Each structure stands twice: as C-alpha cells, then as structure tokens.
C-alpha cells in the first residue's frame, strides 16, 4: 500500500473557515492523505457525517487504514469519483444539502513524489500525469498528438509560459523524430527551447509547462468550476465552502465565482435602502485570502503559494 508522506497546508485555517458543527454533514472534495478529513472528523459527534471524495484509488486505499476508527464508527463515507460529480454522488445517497464543503486543490505530495505517476519534472518517468488512473488521456498523448496551436494555447493559458511558441515548436520537431515518452525527454526539450538567460530565473524552467499539461490532462479548471457551482448550491443556510488554491489560475477562478455569488445585484439609481429580497444569498467569510504564516512556509516550501478563500450562505432564495 502506498504511503502518504504529506503535510497538509492551511489545515486548521481551512477547517476553521467551515465553522464545523458536531451534528453537521460535511464534504471533503479532495481526500488525499486525509489531513482535512481527519480534522473535520475530530470535530464531529456521532450524529455528524463526512463524505470524502477522491478519484485516485491510492488515496481511498490508504485512508481505509488511516481513518479506520471513523469508518468503524460509521462517521465517514469514501466516494471514488471526480468532484465534478459532487451533486450526483450526494443525491444518490439521499442528500440535497450539506453544511460545508472543503477543497485542497492541486496535486497531493504523494502524487508528485511517486515518480511513476509522471507529474514531476524532478524525476525521469513515463509521461502520465493522470489523477484518475482509469482515464484514457495522458500527458504522453497531449505532447505527441496535440497540434502546435493547441500546445501553445495550453502552455500560455494554463502555464502562463512566455516561451509557449518556442517550446511547442521544439516539441513538434522532436516528436517527428521519435516519440516523447518520458518526463526526462520533455524537460530537456523545454530547457533547450527556453533562452539561457530566462532559464536562470523563476525556478525550474519546466515548471510552467508541466503545470499546463497537468491541468489539460485532468481538465482541472473545468471540473473545479463545475464542482464549485454545485457546492455553493448544496450548502445549507450558514453552511460554508472553503477552498485552498496553489496557483493563480485556480485562485482567480475561485475569487470570481465567489464574487459573483456574494455581490449585490445591479440596483436602481437613488435607492435609499436595499430591500431584503435584493440582498445577496452569500457573503465572503473574509475579503482577502488567508495565506500561510512564515513559520508554515519555512516548514513546508510547498505552502508558499497557497491561498484560502471561503464563502457562507446567508439565505435560500427560490429562483
């Protein structure tokens, strides 16, 4: 069985933002190493329940043992599914509303550290990058078959890579000679495509391209938008959705969705008092994102880009 040597980022802050009630029904959309699930379960009474999602069977298997005490008490249910299926999976279990939903986005440390999964530019491994090992699309397929224009688009849009065209052009040339099947091959191509001066700044030169391919393979932004809209609709009054992001694209998406739901509607000019029915159904738990402390960043470098945002439901309006 795989082990999860995983330090959960913003653990206490993310669960504090949920305002857990002992008898509440909660959802952890990203089970991973079980850090957030355990924190919620420790605050639940026997009448409360947690539903934990993960599309990675390795995470489910690990937590069968890791959270065995709570499983035996019947306090937690594991759901092997993409969190884009949040509403469908919960409805199938007789749930129309829950009291809180937490997301810890990005790839878990065990997935990064398992060279065979192909997520990391630090290890030579088959180009894979699938979070759900049963899906067909892999990084190898993207790199070897997607047209030049599509590669440029994902490198720029998902990786914010300034040298997207140069990297895509060299990939196109190299794959015509032989298939690109390992992370090591891809790293060398990226290094050769990016000018030497640019390689010396901004961290590892392959970081942005690897991020872009991972997002494309797993449709991360699409499934996040779908799932977040479902979570916001599912929470009860005073229920909350708490989200930890690790890169700017995800954070901007979360910020935008939360803003859309918590902003006042367009009001007639000169309206002296905003009537109750025009007040938003949701509010931001804090106006600015919560970020890790210096001490947490020093202890865990992967925490440095983390941001936490949360939203609370104030009322349910029949639309």
Swiss-Prot record:
Cross-referenced InterPro entries: RsmH, SAM-dep_MeTrfase_MraW_recog, SAM-dependent_MTases_sf
Annotated GO CC locations: cytoplasm
Compartments, record wording: Cytoplasm
Keyword entries, A-Z: Cytoplasm, Methyltransferase, rRNA processing, S-adenosyl-L-methionine, Transferase
Pfam families (UniProt xref): Methyltransf_5
Family annotation (SUPFAM superfamilies): Putative methyltransferase TM0872, insert domain, S-adenosyl-L-methionine-dependent methyltransferases
Recorded catalytic activity of this chain's protein: cytidine(1402) in 16S rRNA + S-adenosyl-L-methionine = N(4)-methylcytidine(1402) in 16S rRNA + S-adenosyl-L-homocysteine + H(+)
Binding site for S-adenosyl-L-methionine: 34-36, 54, 83, 104, 111
First-tier enzyme category under EC: transferase
EC number: 2.1.1.199
Entry's Gene Ontology BP terms: rRNA base methylation
Molecular function GO labels: rRNA (cytosine-N4-)-methyltransferase activity
Similarity remark: Belongs to the methyltransferase superfamily. RsmH family.
Summary of the function given for this chain in its UniProt record: Specifically methylates the N4 position of cytidine in position 1402 (C1402) of 16S rRNA.
Protein name: Ribosomal RNA small subunit methyltransferase H
Taxonomic source organism: Lactiplantibacillus plantarum (strain ATCC BAA-793 / NCIMB 8826 / WCFS1)
Native organism taxonomy: Bacteria, Bacillati, Bacillota, Bacilli, Lactobacillales
């Amino acid at each position: 069985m795989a082990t999860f040597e995983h330090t959960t980022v913003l653990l206490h802050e993310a669960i504090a933002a949920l305002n857990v009630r002992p008898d509440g029904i909660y959802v952890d959309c990203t089970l991973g190493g079980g850090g957030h699930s355990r924190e919620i379960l420790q605050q639940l009474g026997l009448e409360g329940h947690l539903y934990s999602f993960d599309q990675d069977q390795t995470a489910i298997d690990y937590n069968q043992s890791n959270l065995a005490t709570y499983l035996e008490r019947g306090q937690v249910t594991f759901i092997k599914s993409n969190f884009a299926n949040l509403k469908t999976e919960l409805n199938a279990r007789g749930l129309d509303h829950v009291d809180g939903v937490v997301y810890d986005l990005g790839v878990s440390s065990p997935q990064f550290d398992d060279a065979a999964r192909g997520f990391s530019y630090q290890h030579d491994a088959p180009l894979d990058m699938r979070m759900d090992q049963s899906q067909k699309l892999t990084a190898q397929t993207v790199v070897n078959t997607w047209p030049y224009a599509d590669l440029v688009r994902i490198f720029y849009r998902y990786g914010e890579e300034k040298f997207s065209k140069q990297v895509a052009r060299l990939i196109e040339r190299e794959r015509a000679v032989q298939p690109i099947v390992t992370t090591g091959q891809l790293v060398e191509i990226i290094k050769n495509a990016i000018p030497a001066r640019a390689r010396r700044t901004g961290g590892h030169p392959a970081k942005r391209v690897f991020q872009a391919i991972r997002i494309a393979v797993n449709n991360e932004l699409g499934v996040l938008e779908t799932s977040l809209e479902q979570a916001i609709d599912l929470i009860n009054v005073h229920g909350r959705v708490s989200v930890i992001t690790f890169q700017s694209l995800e954070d901007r998406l979360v910020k935008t969705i939360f803003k859309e739901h918590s902003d006042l509607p367009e009001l007639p000019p000169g309206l002296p008092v905003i009537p109750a029915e025009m007040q938003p159904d949701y509010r931001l738990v804090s106006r600015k994102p919560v970020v890790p402390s210096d001490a947490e960043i020093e202890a865990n470098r992967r925490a440095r880009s983390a941001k936490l945002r949360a939203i609370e439901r104030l009322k349910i309006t029949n639309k």
